[in-house]
Amino acid sequence: MLQLARFYSLARTKAIHSHGAPFRPEYALKCGLEIHTQLNTKNKLFSQSTNSATSLVDAPNHHTSYYDIALPGTQPVLNLEAILFAMKLSLALGSQVNSISQFDRKHYFYGDQPQGYQLTQHYRPFARGGKINLSKELDDIDESAKEIGILQLQIEQDTGKSHYTETDKDVITLVDLNRSNVPLIELVTKPDFSDIKQVRAFIKKYQNLVRHLHISSGDLETGAMRVDVNLSINEYARVELKNLPNTSSIINAIKYEYQRQVELISVGDTSSLMEPETRGWTGSSTVKLRSKETTIDYRYMPDPELPYINLAQDVISGVRGLMPQLPDDIMRMLMKKPYQLSLKDAKILTYNSNQNDMYNHEALRSYYLDTFREFSKLAGERSNAKLPTNWIIHEFLGDLNKLQIPLARAKEILPPPVFAQFLKLLHEEVISATSGKMLLFHILENFKQSNCQDLSIPDFSKLIEKFELHAINQVDPQELMDLCNDVIAQHTDDTFIRNLVTGKKKSSLKFLIGQGMRRSQGRIKANEFEKKFKEILNIQW
């Protein structure tokens, strides 16, 4: 890779400070990443074939054109959507998009590369520079702030897949070219990582960025994102690690390779560390694949069939003006007034894991923000910022997941203004939290039972009256006394009561309050139960 060896020889070594990692300050790690990301374009990079590289259901070689299988006489036609996606990622990373870039042929022979070469950008990459900033506040690293520099981004085409089948006499290789010519972006970082936490945080942040920009699924498990690691210790030669299918493999491979090299250095056996080499990860150890002596000469040359990519500055500026707000900025906004979300809740509204079919982070964030604004109008200055957070992110989402109702459908009966009215009932203590949970679940359950066809907006007043969910403002003292005594009578264990009264197990009081709330169907407030239980049991703490 261009400039990579020079950066590894010049980068300043740093001491390792990683909790739980087997790193020692006297053996300083320098680490960089090469990340290949498949782009979610409609078509492939140089043909009109459908881009379905990560599909697990398509028949082999179903999405291929004459060009994808390298039929003689076919020529590449550049997919401009891939250029747009590359521009969006480059701008999000703060990279310098080159006004002129070009494609080069990287020559090698392998069964899943029918052309005999791969089209990449060796001499004039698409973009250079840029960075991703990590912080203790948002990314759980040990340093207060850490900048990971980007060397370059380049566009290239993916290869096909080889499948191996063993027979009694031989090993048969089957080639699937559905993935051949799928557009990739290769991102190369500087060797700025000095511990495991930084690597893990970077991968997670980069995954979320490409999902946030809608340019890739970012999934390691499907091969939509593939990561190679470059590392060295104490200025010895760089080792490249390959075959890393997921984040845990990446982390474990770095740990193993670090320990392997430390053991060699500590006993003075450093001859094998003097020259760069490539090693593969088996799942439990790294094994040598090739050394400098066996490195392939790719014989790079400019592709004569493709013109330069020439981007005018007004095109770059136009795309910059269409860029969405970036995840870190969104999270910091959500964690400040008026929203005041916790980091965990802010990430739920910002990070897209691709693992939840009920909602995506953008739709959920939009619903939350719209509801928050509507609730603030209704409640005025007395509005409680935590109420929309708790009820949307925790209760509402929990019900949607339990009932398997997509957010897009639930919004039809509970649009933000209606959900804000529901929050107002809780805010003004017309209903208790327990009654609110029952009411919300009842509304969604009925909607589910209608196969999401009954789009009637719920009438909260009628439902509250029907199910007698009104909070009791004037509690009958005798009724409350009887309820509390009944709850206490269910616990004949003297140790339970004694530990509660002495304060040895204060949490037991919350348990009793919960029992009372259930018996009253949430109509009697928790603080009423707390006062009465303390009175009956003579609790002094």
Swiss-Prot record:
It comes from Saccharomyces cerevisiae (strain RM11-1a) (Baker's yeast). Subunit of the heterotrimeric GatFAB amidotransferase (AdT) complex, composed of A, B and F subunits. GO terms for molecular function: ATP binding; glutaminyl-tRNA synthase (glutamine-hydrolyzing) activity. The keyword Protein biosynthesis applies. This is Glutamyl-tRNA(Gln) amidotransferase subunit B, mitochondrial. It comes from the Eukaryota. GO terms for biological process: glutaminyl-tRNAGln biosynthesis via transamidation; mitochondrial translation. Keywords: ATP-binding, Ligase, Mitochondrion, Nucleotide-binding, Protein biosynthesis. It is an enzyme of class 6 (ligase).
